[in-house]
């Protein structure tokens, strides 16, 4: 499969006939937000997410995330038969993954060497719940503190945000007020309590 980069730093409109990869690209993007292979809208009769997007040991999806203080990358890779994540504290550079002959490096050690020692590379994040906690800022637990800088929002109550994003990506009918209220409720740090006395 040829190497491809897609810039998504503004409004993007995908057009094309059936089977050219529009939904494939949207699902890869949705996976960044929901990290839930069962909720990507892949029909049961199609190949699984892992089999389709990561057919080879050197298959990767790299997401570059822009933030106020610079960019970082989220690397999705297959390890021990399932997709896991690593965070790289640097803007994306294709030279990390592709050699001068335009071939993708086959070993993680080669990629690590290309990234170099000057950029932080996280340990493997194998739990999808932990990954979502990292990017949605539910990071008060001690083991998540090194990942705090990778949060795209800061909320312990983020659970409805990935669902709402998923519904937008999968063209589910949504009301704008529902989306707005979901985001507002997710950002609130207040604990709601109900007095039954």
Specify the residue positions occupied by each region the protein language model found.
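Generic recognition of flexible, low-complexity loop/linker segments
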Residues: 2-3, 48-51, 168-171
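Active-site-proximal structural scaffolding
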Residues: 7, 22, 54-56, 176
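Post-Walker A helix-loop "phosphate-sensing" segment adjacent to the P-loop in P-loop NTPases
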Residues: 31-44
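Pre-Walker A-like glycine/lysine-rich segment at the N-terminus of P-loop NTPase domains
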Residues: 1-29
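Generic structural signal for hydrophobic core residues of well-folded globular domains
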Residues: 17, 29, 33, 186-191
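Nucleotide-state sensing region of NTPase/ATPase domains
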Residues: 47-147
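Generic detector of solvent-exposed, compositionally biased contiguous segments
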Residues: 27, 39-40, 53-56
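Extended, Lys/Glu-rich alpha-helical coiled-coil stalks
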Residues: 119-197
